[in-house]
Swiss-Prot record:
Covalent S-S links between cysteines: none
UniProt name for this protein: UPF0502 protein YceH
Cross-referenced PANTHER family: UPF0502 PROTEIN YCEH
Family the entry assigns: Belongs to the UPF0502 family.
Gene name in the database record: yceH
SUPFAM superfamilies tied to this protein: Winged helix' DNA-binding domain
A Pfam family recorded for this sequence: DUF480
Highest taxon of the lineage: Bacteria
Classification via InterPro entries: DUF480, WH-like_DNA-bd_sf, WH_DNA-bd_sf
Organism: Salmonella arizonae (strain ATCC BAA-731 / CDC346-86 / RSK2980)
Length: 215
């Protein structure tokens, strides 16, 4: 697969995919916007603390690889970035809205169960039921130009198998073992995280609006 990303590159692309859908009025993103999105404490696993210089290096590299492109509007001296990772005019990777939501959530959070993915991806796409989540994951796992996700072996004591994206290469399942219980408490945690993400984005929108009114 030609999509061989580092963990930081996956975070940058995941953030741009997320913000393109959830906060379209702030998209494309400036370097500062990408830094803020990458270092979010909600809906991110692991939480990162990237510097602007480190993010700029990742952006420059991704532009060279044609996964991103720069956008400069008339009269706007700030360079902004938009993703060309999928669904771009000349790109090869075409994903449905449901597939984009799942891929984005996997890029931002790593291996997750279908239940966790349904809850955490809900701001990008509203799945009708668990069957739709699972069928979308299976399509991503069986695509001729893929596979793009893999179903991991179910861990002892867990009800659901987790899925992981393959955009960073082969998966070492042992390194993905977690102590998070796949139970009602895990579902509750997912719902709390989704609410925290919504609050964080509303605060970001309010700050942006107040800054605009103060200009």
């Amino acid at each position: 697969m030609k999509y061989e990303l580092t963990a930081t590159e996956a975070r940058v692309i995941g953030c741009l995919l997320e913000k393109q859908v959830t906060t379209p009025e702030q998209y494309p993103l400036s370097v500062h916007g990408v830094v803020t999105a990458c270092n979010q404490k909600t809906n991110r696993e692991p939480v990162m603390n990237l510097t602007e210089q480190a993010v700029q290096e990742q952006l420059d590299n991704l532009v060279k690889r044609h996964f991103l492109r720069t956008v400069s509007g008339f009269g706007n001296r700030v360079t902004k970035y938009e993703q060309r990772f999928c669904n771009s005019e000349f790109g090869d990777l075409k994903l449905s809205a449901a597939e984009v939501a799942l891929v984005t959530t996997l890029l931002l959070r790593g291996a997750q169960t279908p239940g966790e993915l349904r809850s955490r991806a809900s701001r990008m796409y509203e799945f009708s039921d668990m069957a739709e989540v699972e069928s979308t994951l299976e399509r991503l796992a069986s695509r001729e130009d893929g596979p793009y996700v893999i179903r991991l072996a179910r861990e002892p004591g867990k009800r659901e198998s987790r899925y992981m994206h393959l955009f960073c290469g082969d998966v070492d399942e042992l390194s993905l073992q977690t102590s998070v219980p796949d139970s009602a408490s895990g579902d509750l945690q997912s719902r709390v995280e989704a609410l925290e993400s919504e609050v964080a984005e509303l605060k970001q929108r309010l700050d942006s609006l107040l800054a605009h009114l103060g200009e």
